[in-house]
Amino acid sequence: MTSTDVQVALTFDFDGYSTWIGSHRATSPSMLSRGEFDPIGARRILRVLEQAAIPATFFVPGHSALAFPPVVCAFRDGGHEIGHHGWVHENPVLLTREEERSVLLRGLEALDKVAGVRPSGYRSPAWDNSPSTVELLLEFGFEYESSMMGNDHEPYWCRIGDAWSTSEEFRFGLPVDLVEMPVAWHLDDFPQFEFLATDKGYLPGGRAPSTVLEIWKAEFDFLYQRIGSGVMVVTMHPQIMGRGHRLLMLEEFIRHVASHERAGFTTCQDYVRQWRKGRSPSLPADAGDNRLTR
């Protein structure tokens, strides 16, 4: 992280086939072929990042790393961060604790085998954590995770033991030594652009890049002008953002950020390590008194 006050973390989920196999249960080569575009989109994005001389974070499922090893090595060789993104894009909420532990281990083994990296960061497939996720991430030595939305432009400490029901007041769990790099659906390209048919209906996608660019630029401008410091985490997928008209939008967004004197780009890891200095796990400032005690 540089000395600039406002940072943008460009993050890319290199899902490959895994999202269509693990999350969407692909039964046809046509659906699966969407993931085959991921390496093409990723190579294009890498060229954009290289030309702009900016770092990024790539969250990679183990399945995708083994399917497309040269691309994952290109992330590493380009000086970018590689994060953990499950094994085959499975939702942790649907797993037992032991199954989730196995998924974390299998993903780590794949990333080590392909690129020789041990990620410090994790992003849950589908942005959905189980009651066991935070404890397991601590067990495996992760420094941060990036799947929750309890803030917008400020990291915060993850917790263990939050409790809620319709009949009782919310109870805050124990803050632990795991940092959350918050995300947001309006800063994710998937719901904006991807067409998806499910048994529950359609995700229409297909929005004009100009509309999404307007949202992202406005979010950045609010951070820069009104808050004055912090981080904006943008989530993209090479198989989506790597399409020509959207890649032009990404280039325009990068130019917009770069035109501001106090702004720069960061990896999630770099921002988290800087943010941690002088801080220790704590609850949100506005948390009530109903709290879990040891």
Question: Where do the PLM segments sit?
Answer:
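Generic structural signal for well-ordered alpha-helices
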Residues: 42-46, 69-73, 101-108, 134, ...
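Acidic-and-aromatic substrate-binding clefts and catalytic sites of carbohydrate-active enzymes
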Residues: 34-39, 57-69, 90-100, 123-132, ...
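Conserved, mostly hydrophobic/aromatic
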Residues: 13, 49, 82-85, 122, ...
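C-terminal domain-boundary segment and adjacent tail
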Residues: 2-3, 51-52, 206-294
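Short, well-ordered coil/turn segments that N-cap beta-strands
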Residues: 4-8, 52-56, 78-81, 115-120, ...
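Long, hydrophobic, well-ordered secondary-structure blocks that form the structural core
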Residues: 66, 79-138
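Active-site beta->alpha N-cap acidic-glycine motif
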Residues: 2-81, 256
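Active-site-adjacent pocket scaffolds in enzyme catalytic domains
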Residues: 112-113, 117-228, 284
